[in-house]
């Protein structure tokens, strides 16, 4: 596998992290807010400012936007589905102006631990022609084979709908499943990931390993999976530049980030991943 084959998607939740990821050689950005919460929908301001940055600097990179209206589980009510639809429509508007915004990231479940096929299919169709990644809500499902088959059936259904539609336009599809193999990290779930890779053969779905991937284990993961894309964070913790600090006031609940530190992508870590992957 040549060095050009390996691509790294980097999750980012600030413009500074976006710039670091781009300068570090990321192939794709997963654009979010609040990575502390697992990633939520980014603000319009962040999307527009990133659009302006890549246009002004003539940068070519794929950007997939997280569509997740709140933290917590992935069981959404109809009001939350409506919010997600509006957010997808906004991403499509930005995509029409800037082709780098080429995909969205979603994940919806039923209360019994199955994929919410009905609403997922609606969002995939609405997102067309953007690519769709189904995120690690997949790892929270009750059965990975059942879940994969459900997502693949959505692709088959949307393809048939597109063939029967004479209005033109792209065909909405789920292009990737982001997964740690139903475990807390990719290495722990590697056997399940290998089974998912087998299931994906002959389909339009690419398995995208993500979760606990480090420079120390990336070579092992590449050798075991033989995939060409991996999802990483590559973050470091930076100290706040605030000189005055009121340590008696907190902006969140008991489980929260400190107001005086923040995580940011480190371009050197991304370059380290790239260098490590080139040794395979």
Curated annotation (Swiss-Prot):
Presence of the UniProt keyword Chloroplast in the record: no
InterPro entries reported for this sequence: CutC-like (IPR005627), CutC-like_dom_sf (IPR036822)
GO MF: copper ion binding
SUPFAM superfamilies listed in its UniProt record: CutC-like
Cytoplasm among keywords: no
Pfam hit, one: CutC
Keywords: Copper
Coiled coil (UniProt feature): none
Function: Involved in copper homeostasis.
The family this protein is said to belong to: Belongs to the CutC family.
HAMAP family per record: CutC
Name under which the protein is recorded: Copper homeostasis protein cutC homolog
Gene symbol of the encoding locus: cutc
